[in-house]
Amino acid sequence: MKLQDSLRKIIRQSGSGRWVQGSGAVQGACDTLPGDPGAGGSPFLMKLLAAAVLLAGGLASGCASDASSGEQNPSLAAEAAESVSENQKSGIRSGGAAGSPSYARAKGNAKLTIWVADYQGYNGIAKVGERFTRDTGVKVNVVHYGQADVQFQYASAAGVAPDIFLSGHDRFGEWAKEGLIAQLAPGAEEKARFTGLAWDAVTIGGKIYGYPMGIWALGLICNRKLVPDAPENWEDFIALDNKLQKKGVRAIYWDYTTPYYTYPLISANGGYSFKKASDGFYDTGKTGVANEGAKSGLKFLIDLIWNGHMRKGADYGVMQQEFSGGRLGCILDGPWSWAGYDQAGIDFSVNRLPKLNGMRSRPFVSVQSFVISASSPNRDLAVDFLENYLLTDDGIRDVNDDVAIGVPALRSFQALSGRNSRIAATMENVRGGDLIPSIPEMYRFWSAFQTALREAVTGRQGADEALEDAAKGIAKQ
């Protein structure tokens, strides 16, 4: 059935097609996360929005491109649907292996489609895909999106998901619950090749749902020319800013109204999102976003801003621009940004996050991992590609040479990267960080904490009141 027919069928089932009018669905796909307030959460609306989004050519050309050719892809929905159709004809089913009859029939006939975000080294993945094609005859199509997680969830609901998808682990719990991603069964030898932390991130309820690649955590990134020695304490930035302002430069800036970036300040003295209970599951009825440690962190941020040591108005793009232009001493950013600062000609260091009140900041830790769509008829091919081609020293090198993957989850490549000071510093931040809980309730945390940050830094609410309101919203059942 064509995707257009699928949309018509869904509309007929609903009795109304009014939800797919104008360009609202397209805009929402790029800018709104499923589960956020106003995004719509029912299975029917998800499927309807998915079909509408994927049918819209404007979204495909505006949010994604074909990594293989570097050209804009006019219809990713058609590409995905074609891939599913071709692979179904090949007779590939889950549970096969290289050398099995189903695998043999796939050669020269099937196609693996891989979706990644714009910042995730798609050129390197495409390079590995070319080797896989030469060896097996199976075509590999690598597609990249601006809002990749959003597109994956919509495409899964519409039945046109890619075979493989690269994402941070924090959505896996939700996707596993919704049946969007396949449970995996790597052998003991395969598991031994990766760090335990990486497997912990992709394990939901004792079951594995992803193959880990790189581990991300924020670091304190400093321009060596302006700040030869990175500050050890957050409090040190006050004197440093007084000094650098005389040169027309600011000491520190980051996207401080985005929870991911400001979490290190509230976590330094004991703030947290959710903690695991004794049964191994997160206690979502309790949050540490409003404890005394969290409040002290937010108050310090407010003081930095209102005492003139950090510009008013948080903007990630402005931060990148100012740092790339040599007008910022230090920023908070992650491995995905390193290549851009290198290209800008900035000699920078990556350092451990500073201490606040003598306690080390704890960043959120994200494990970038590959999942296999539950609807993919090519799980055996996908596993072969991931285990024997991409997640090897040669494969990871190709991806890392394109865009830094952070701390390698692959032990052997981690050993090869041991002398890299950026990776070493990121490793320290990872070890001292908090793994992002892979639970749907994190939406409450992101939303409520962001509101608290915006209210507090603008003075509309005090730090205590803003965080206490956030805690009520986060811990609601």
Please place each PLM-identified region on the residue numbering.
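Extracytoplasmic/periplasmic substrate-binding proteins
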Residues: 127-128, 299-381
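Extracytoplasmic "Venus flytrap"/periplasmic binding protein-like
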Residues: 127-194, 209, 224-228, 232, ...
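Short, solvent-exposed loop/beta-turn-alpha elements that line the ligand-binding surface or hinge
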Residues: 102-106, 186-194, 272-296, 343, ...
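Hinge/lid segment of periplasmic solute-binding proteins
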Residues: 84-108, 169-219, 229, 234-241, ...
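C-terminal capping/gating helix-and-loop segments adjacent to ligand/active sites or protein-protein/ligand interfaces
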Residues: 117, 203, 370, 401-411, ...
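Conserved N-terminal structural module of periplasmic/extracytoplasmic solute-binding proteins
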Residues: 2-4, 8-12, 52, 57, ...
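Glycine-centered hinge/linker elements that transmit conformational signals in sensory
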Residues: 241, 283-313
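Periplasmic solute-binding protein
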Residues: 170-180, 197-235, 256-282, 364-372, ...
